[in-house]
Amino acid sequence: MSTRFQEHYQSKVVADLIAKFGYKSVMEVPRITKVTLNMGLGDAVNDKKIIENAVGDLTKVAGQKPVVTKAKKAIAGFKIRQGYPIGAMVTLRSSRMYEFLDRFVTVALPRVRDFRGISGKAFDGRGNYNIGVKEQIIFPEIEYDKIDALRGLNISITTTAKTDEEAKALLAAFKFPFRN
């Protein structure tokens, strides 16, 4: 089952990127390999319900159960012991990834307060893009009445692009609303 974004990539994006960058093979064209959603929950040390609620929110947003991340080492200043649950993350690939990106670009991003576009400078130098979301309520799957606290999450989009310019062209072809 291919999604709307997958069909858009195969029918339009590949041809556009070959024309723009002059790739010799279709396999050279950059593609999105995975999307990772990460929610850091430092305040979960005192309350275990926070982790459960965050896992529930991420499950609704991603459509897949996240893994609870645990502290690698103890940090006395933050009252964290090794092995304490301090976050949740989920990695999306193939059709779930494209479905999430479709919902993120078309539904969630326009719901951000005072939204003027996403930064074009958040690339890491190797063609990957990171975006932070301050509130999980921008996603339509999250019901405002049922959340206990506003939590942000980090979205990492990993691509096969060699440069930031190629990655930006790829994401722009997927209608990512860049500011500049």
From Swiss-Prot:
GO terms for cellular component: ribonucleoprotein complex; ribosome. SUPFAM superfamilies: RL5-like (SSF55282). The keyword DNA repair does not apply. InterPro entries: Ribosomal_uL5 (IPR002132), Ribosomal_uL5_bac-type (IPR020930), Ribosomal_uL5_C (IPR031309), Ribosomal_uL5_CS (IPR020929), Ribosomal_uL5_dom_sf (IPR022803), Ribosomal_uL5_N (IPR031310). GO terms for biological process: translation. It holds the Pfam family Ribosomal_L5. GO terms for molecular function: rRNA binding; structural constituent of ribosome; tRNA binding. PROSITE patterns: RIBOSOMAL_L5. Gene3D superfamilies: 3.30.1440.10. Keywords: Ribonucleoprotein, Ribosomal protein, RNA-binding, rRNA-binding, tRNA-binding. HAMAP family: Ribosomal_uL5_B. Belongs to the universal ribosomal protein uL5 family. Part of the 50S ribosomal subunit; part of the 5S rRNA/L5/L18/L25 subcomplex. Contacts the 5S rRNA and the P site tRNA. Forms a bridge to the 30S subunit in the 70S ribosome. NCBIfam families: PRK00010.1. This is one of the proteins that bind and probably mediate the attachment of the 5S RNA into the large ribosomal subunit, where it forms part of the central protuberance. In the 70S ribosome it contacts protein S13 of the 30S subunit (bridge B1b), connecting the 2 subunits; this bridge is implicated in subunit movement. Contacts the P site tRNA; the 5S rRNA and some of its associated proteins might help stabilize positioning of ribosome-bound tRNAs. This is Large ribosomal subunit protein uL5. It comes from Polynucleobacter necessarius subsp. necessarius (strain STIR1).
